[in-house]
C-alpha cells in the first residue's frame, strides 16, 4: 500500500508521513492510485457538503470550493497558472515555453486564468448544490486524477530528471490501462447516463489538451498535468450543471 500513501501525500495536503524515501518503482506505481486518491477527496468533500446543508447557498458553495482547494494544497492550480503564463508568453516556442514554466513568478495571464477557472467552478458548484445533486463531488476529483494517469500513460515526459520523470519511466502500463477502464465503469455505475455524458465530454477535452501539449512541447510536464486535472474537473462540473 506504500504507492497509495505516496499518491495521497503527493496529490494533497493531508498530513501523510512515509516510512522512508520511495524507490523509483514505487513512485511509478503510485500513479495507479491517483483515481483512488480522487475518491478519498470526493468522500471528504461529500461529508463536508452534508455538514453544510442548511447554510446559505452562496456561502455553502464558497466553502466547498475552499475545502476543495485546500485538500490539494493548490498544487494543481499552480500548474495551471504556470501553464497559462507559458502558453501565452512562449509565442509557440518550445524552449521559451518550458523556461517560463519554471519561473516561480505569476504574470497577469496566470491570474486571469485562475480567476476564471475558480469563478466557473464556484458557479457550477452553486448550481449543483441548488439541484440537490451530490455525485459530482465524487466524479470530478476522480476523473481529474484519472486524467493525470491517462496523460502519463500515453504522453512523453519532456523534463529529464526529477519526480515526474520517475513517474513516467516506472508507471506499469498494463495495470494503468485496467485502472482507467475500471474508473470509467465506476463513473457510469455511479452516475448512469450522466456519467456517460461526462466521460464523453472529458475525453474530448483530454485529447484536445494533449494535442496542444504535443504540438507545443512534444509531451507533458508536471505543470501541464496539473493544468489538465483542473480543467477536466471544471469540465465535469460544467457538464453536470448544464445537463
Swiss-Prot record:
Signal peptide: none annotated. Belongs to the CobS family. The keyword Isomerase does not apply. This is Adenosylcobinamide-GDP ribazoletransferase. It is a multi-pass membrane protein. The keyword S-adenosyl-L-methionine does not apply. It is found in: Cell inner membrane. Its cofactor is Mg(2+). It catalyses: alpha-ribazole + adenosylcob(III)inamide-GDP = adenosylcob(III)alamin + GMP + H(+); alpha-ribazole 5'-phosphate + adenosylcob(III)inamide-GDP = adenosylcob(III)alamin 5'-phosphate + GMP + H(+). Its EC number is 2.7.8.26. Joins adenosylcobinamide-GDP and alpha-ribazole to generate adenosylcobalamin (Ado-cobalamin). Also synthesizes adenosylcobalamin 5'-phosphate from adenosylcobinamide-GDP and alpha-ribazole 5'-phosphate. The chain crosses the membrane at residues 31-51, 55-75, 109-129, 133-153, 188-208. GO terms for biological process: cobalamin biosynthetic process. Keywords: Cell inner membrane, Cell membrane, Cobalamin biosynthesis, Magnesium, Membrane, Transferase, Transmembrane, Transmembrane helix. Pathway: Cofactor biosynthesis; adenosylcobalamin biosynthesis; adenosylcobalamin from cob(II)yrinate a,c-diamide: step 7/7. One of its GO terms (cellular component) is plasma membrane. GO terms for molecular function: adenosylcobinamide-GDP ribazoletransferase activity; cobalamin 5'-phosphate synthase activity.
